[in-house]
Curated annotation (Swiss-Prot):
Pfam families: LRR_1, LRR_14, LRRNT_2, PK_Tyr_Ser-Thr. This is Probable LRR receptor-like serine/threonine-protein kinase At3g47570. It catalyses: L-seryl-[protein] + ATP = O-phospho-L-seryl-[protein] + ADP + H(+); L-threonyl-[protein] + ATP = O-phospho-L-threonyl-[protein] + ADP + H(+). One of its GO terms (molecular function) is ATP binding. It is an enzyme of class 2 (transferase). Residues 702-1002 form the Protein kinase domain. It comes from Arabidopsis thaliana (Mouse-ear cress). The modification Phosphothreonine is found at residue 699. Glycans are attached at residues 48, 88, 136, 184, 221, 232, 281, 294, 334, 358, 431, 455, 470, 582, 600.
Amino acid sequence: MRLFLLLAFNALMLLETHGFTDETDRQALLQFKSQVSEDKRVVLSSWNHSFPLCNWKGVTCGRKNKRVTHLELGRLQLGGVISPSIGNLSFLVSLDLYENFFGGTIPQEVGQLSRLEYLDMGINYLRGPIPLGLYNCSRLLNLRLDSNRLGGSVPSELGSLTNLVQLNLYGNNMRGKLPTSLGNLTLLEQLALSHNNLEGEIPSDVAQLTQIWSLQLVANNFSGVFPPALYNLSSLKLLGIGYNHFSGRLRPDLGILLPNLLSFNMGGNYFTGSIPTTLSNISTLERLGMNENNLTGSIPTFGNVPNLKLLFLHTNSLGSDSSRDLEFLTSLTNCTQLETLGIGRNRLGGDLPISIANLSAKLVTLDLGGTLISGSIPYDIGNLINLQKLILDQNMLSGPLPTSLGKLLNLRYLSLFSNRLSGGIPAFIGNMTMLETLDLSNNGFEGIVPTSLGNCSHLLELWIGDNKLNGTIPLEIMKIQQLLRLDMSGNSLIGSLPQDIGALQNLGTLSLGDNKLSGKLPQTLGNCLTMESLFLEGNLFYGDIPDLKGLVGVKEVDLSNNDLSGSIPEYFASFSKLEYLNLSFNNLEGKVPVKGIFENATTVSIVGNNDLCGGIMGFQLKPCLSQAPSVVKKHSSRLKKVVIGVSVGITLLLLLFMASVTLIWLRKRKKNKETNNPTPSTLEVLHEKISYGDLRNATNGFSSSNMVGSGSFGTVYKALLLTEKKVVAVKVLNMQRRGAMKSFMAECESLKDIRHRNLVKLLTACSSIDFQGNEFRALIYEFMPNGSLDMWLHPEEVEEIHRPSRTLTLLERLNIAIDVASVLDYLHVHCHEPIAHCDLKPSNVLLDDDLTAHVSDFGLARLLLKFDEESFFNQLSSAGVRGTIGYAAPEYGVGGQPSINGDVYSFGILLLEMFTGKRPTNELFGGNFTLNSYTKSALPERILDIVDESILHIGLRVGFPVVECLTMVFEVGLRCCEESPMNRLATSIVVKELISIRERFFKASRTTWR
């Protein structure tokens, strides 16, 4: 009986204790929730008294005592601060707050969690020092505080956490020296301290970390010789000490002492001496980066490292300009996994061995530029079929380009400048349709510029200056719409500058100086709105300087040594970014402007124009004569003529006004008829119309197998027009749907008079009766073989048969965004009447063979100058102007009129979707948490957390330049999505910003991996 009472008493006490402690955990978590930002708190909606504590989201309890042991709240978009109440969860073993938006400091109360083994607060916005209380958590195995804003030094108390297996402080603002107490962490396997501001030498106590296999110290300010302690860590697999201030020589036996290395990055330091030959004995080695040091001597053979994928030795002083310097390349043919080889900017001599053609078929990057290599390019270079980047510039290579080079169809970057290459530029270059940069400048190429270069539709930079080329500038080059840089200077080109130069609206640099070009400068040159550098000096151009006032961003202009005449245009004075203007040695005359760049005689050269006058004193020109008396006398006689002319003009204007009023009245009488019947004025401008029967045959009876898409007003079919043997897209309208006829008319009216390379081309229309006597309407467009942008952004939602075989690269997305922005700018600004698309979204952006974007579906488009209030409300009643949920501007939801600002909003959403991979209607979003706020909350530190993962593929090194470019893209998107229409960017600015971003990205991609 006594035993029974004792057991009952103990059970009662246990229940009371359990009830008390369970409530403690509950209150601690509710207090934690109260400190979470209100807009993020919905994620924790289950945290209330209606749910059992152990069923709360992210909460795991112990089996016996039902105390909270695990709190897993990673990647839930939570914000606010971390409540000190977290310290009351005394049974907590694991706390995961990874990748949220928590700010403030880490509460000292975390130190009360004596059972804690796993703590992850990485990728937040935490600041301040690491709290000293944390070091009471003596059971900690994993401590991750990476990618925050933590400051102060690495505390010596860290050494008391002797059970630590992983310590990650990457990407903070830690300062000072490493404490010697780190040596106490003898169980440590991973230590990440990269991207901080740590300094000093690595303490010798690190040698005690005998279990460590990953040590990352990259991008700090560490100094001294290669840390001697590291030679003792034979278990190391991943070692990164790059981009510090280390110096001195490496031990010859490094490869013996560290035999298990998979990755070794020591680039960007000040190491001297030779590369230890023992490194080639590490059979497990996959990545070796010793670039950007002061290493000398020969390069050892790496034939015994079969798994080597990356070898970076560039930017050193390796080699001795001898014929044997390149012998090591032959041994690399054994490295069948090699993807990246960078050995440029060294002192390597000798002929380029033919063995490079036998390197790994997986090779993507080959950089031998900036050395002393001679000989010719091996004929079998075409064996490297996966090569994307080939850099052989600044050498002494000679001879013609081998024909097998034309087999490198994946090549994106070909740099051969400053060699002694000869022969003609081969036509097979045009087969390399993926090329983005082609640099053949400063060689001995001769003959004409091949027209096949026009096939390289992805080309961003074309450098063929300083050769011996002749002939005219091929018109085909003017079709490369994405071209940013075009340099043909220093040749013997003849003929005129093509009128089509204005089609290169993305052009930033045009350099055609020192040729034999002639004729007048085309007015279309003023259409190159993104021009920054214009060099046309040393030619035979004549006539007036054309209207270039659209080039408001230009920085350098050189028109010297030509035969130009007329006056100096005043608009040069208004160019705020103009830094250099050379108009010397022409036949210019008249008054020199005195404002803007003309206020400084050192930035403007106008010598050799004998009839110029005026200007500031620095030009030392003769003063301009005032009006001669004879001119004054003539003035009165001209006055009568002016008065008569003005009178006649006013009379004509009055007559024209009366005629216009009459015409408007007549058109209003015809309004109802025109609403329901396509008039000849609408359709006759299109090609010859096609019959219902022809379309039925072309689509196999409108078969479902021919269907390629559907929308609110109809279905799109792929069709083969037998008469023209041409594949087209046929949009058949659902005439039962209210508003279908208005959609048909709007699309015809919108597209009949507009032409732009990024608009889908409307070929013709069909207005007929089907075989059952029903009204039939269809629009026939050119067919886009690569489908819609929507398919590429969300392939998981597409049937496998239509699914793209790969994902879009970052550069391809930028190009598509520029295409779409360009067409909006055209519709909004450059059409005779502004047009608002009103339904811009990924499914309405179609892609052709080259992934050039074409905007489609103008069923909701509005010709804004023809807009009137009555028609707007008629359209609104049929849901016409509302566009698509998620993409439509907020003002449309409250009766706002269609506008170009509404299109800008839709474009902003489109841009965010393109780079996050998330639709605005994603289930993640709701209430005030939208795609906009999701993006805004990640700027600027957490960009990579929201970027579409498919962008971050193996071919893209995610470094600071890439992150910077992505940040700028998102900022443009957010500025387009401003709530107030008046605060949104103009499309012209959007185009300019995106092109500038693309240039930044392109410049970053020109440098090899670091």
